[in-house]
Amino acid sequence: MDALELLLNRRSQPRLKAPAPQGDALKNIMQAAMRAPDHASLAPWRFIVCEELGLNKLGSIFEQSAIENDKSEKEIERAPQLPLRAPMVIVAIAQYKEHEKVPRVEQIASASCAVMAMQLAAVAQGFNGIWRTGAYAHCELVKAALELSSDDEIVGFLYLGTPAFEIPDKPAPNSDAHFTFWR
């Protein structure tokens, strides 16, 4: 798959199964994150790769968050199962670093670009994934359990694995509605 085909046809895959990327495939995914746009070479990101028992640990953190935040019984019951929807979840964190020329929003954007690069690298190697956020990405209890600082921000949970089925074709949105040209 060439790069342009990958970019024009990328789709999230919510149904994932084992195996997850391992060995060189995982190393390529990790290295792709390092090529994200990065003003002043701050590397304002950190990643936690959860697999096997790590998925259960992340699920326990979600469950505790649901309990502490007075979620419904159904949400509390569902919380520990969320990370088990894929054989691997990469927690992507924007790790803010004070810099006079690189504001917080730019560092969050950089970490977000790293997530996109990882998903594209996964797809290029025959895997796929879905970038999820939700309440747990913005929960102080989750941040504390992951030992993040108050300045850190979870930009998402990248679920990775082998596609459980082929995603049906869907036309891409028309780009014309989103671009204005000044000439």
Question: Where are the regions a protein language model picked out?
Answer:
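Short, well-ordered beta-strand micro-motif
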Residues: 49-51, 91, 159
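C-terminal helix-cap and adjacent tail motif
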Residues: 3-12, 154-183
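Structural motif
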Residues: 87-89, 155
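N-terminal amphipathic, basic helical "cap/leader" segment at the start of enzyme domains
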Residues: 1-85, 183
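Short, charged/polar surface micro-motifs in flexible loops or helix N-caps
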Residues: 52-57, 63-64, 96-98, 140, ...
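Small-aliphatic-rich amphipathic alpha-helix that forms the alpha element of a beta-alpha
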Residues: 33, 90, 96-144
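Short, electropositive alpha-helical surface patch
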Residues: 142-153
